[in-house]
Each structure stands twice: as C-alpha cells, then as structure tokens.
C-alpha cells in the first residue's frame, strides 16, 4: 500500500497534518492519502492478483507473503465483510492468517493474526 505523504507517519501524525482529508479517508475507501493509494485501489490490485493465483494454482495450497493492507483485503474478501474491517482488524508484524478460497467462489477464514510461533 502506498500511503504517499503519510508514509512513515503515525496514525495521529497523519490526522494532525491533514485533519479533513484524514477524516474523509477514514470514511471513504475511495479517498487516497496525499500522493498515495486508496484502499479501493489496493483492493482492485490485490483481488486481481488473487484471481490470477486462483486460476494458476487451482486445487493447490499457496502461501502469500505480503503487507498488512493486502492481507486485510484478502480477509475482507473471504469474509464478505464491509470496509470497516480495514480499520478494526489488527495484524501484528510477521503474523499468520489463513483464508481458504474454493472453486465455487466460497471462502473460509481459518486463522487470523497468529503469532505463537514467533
């Protein structure tokens, strides 16, 4: 995810720096940070890759290693959840989440934010 001018800032710092934009960003997944990428843009990119992986590796187990927002996007997709999950779901660094996607389009989330192995 490209957070643009907010990259490296804490959540509070971004809110203080761009108060109105930050509020808009929190309420609308189509709003990007300054010079950054919206959550909708991330979802389009991630779900496109998801479809390519499903097609290429049908019936196989695939490990995807990524950053927080793409993982949250895949979990959101698997749960058929709304955008609020992007702001309410915490994922630790190096955590393990497991979502299974089936040929009929169904999905199941088996594990989220597991860190016991660390």
Predicted stretch roles:
Residues 1-16, 55-61, 76-118:
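Acidic, low-complexity terminal tails and accessory targeting/binding regions
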Residues 1-47, 111:
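Phosphate-handling substructures
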Residues 30, 75-76:
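A short alpha-helix capping/helix-coil boundary motif
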Residues 40-42, 51, 89-91:
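Short, charged/polar low-complexity linear motifs in solvent-exposed/disordered segments
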Residues 43, 47-55, 75:
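Generic structural signal for well-ordered alpha-helical scaffold segments
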Residues 67:
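Short basic (Lys/Arg) and small-residue
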Residues 70-71:
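Alpha-helix capping/helix-boundary segments
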């Amino acid at each position: 995810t490209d957070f643009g001018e907010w990259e490296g800032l804490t959540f509070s710092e971004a809110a203080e720096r761009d108060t109105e934009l930050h509020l808009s960003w929190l309420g609308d997944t189509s709003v990007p940070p300054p010079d950054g990428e919206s959550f909708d843009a991330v979802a389009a990119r991630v779900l496109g890759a998801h479809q390519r992986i499903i097609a290429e590796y049908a019936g196989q187990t695939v490990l995807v290693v990524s950053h927080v927002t793409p993982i949250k996007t895949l979990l959101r997709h698997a749960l058929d959840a709304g955008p609020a999950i992007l702001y309410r779901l915490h994922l630790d660094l190096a955590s393990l989440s497991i979502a299974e996607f089936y040929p009929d389009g169904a999905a199941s989330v088996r594990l989220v934010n597991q860190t016991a192995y660390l």
